[in-house]
Amino acid sequence: MGGGAEMKVRYNKLWKLLIDKGMKKSQLREAVGASKSTFAKLGKNENVTLPVLLNICEYLECDFGDIMEAVPENEV
């Protein structure tokens, strides 16, 4: 491939969006039917399944770019 830095996902935008909406992580987790372990993965910027991300976006009425970003691995 391109030989550049490996990219990782960061979910900081999701946490900021929740703050802006006055919502707790637990409220979102329950609303979208996600497990505690899935939200632990989000908190550690680990991979989660696409259906989980789709449910979050649908509930928050936003797009993927509003809740996550791809950054070089050394910035995660």
Task: Give the location of each predicted region.
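The alpha-helix within a helix-turn-helix
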Residues: 18, 29, 43, 57
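DNA major-groove recognition helix of helix-turn-helix/homeodomain DNA-binding modules
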Residues: 52-66
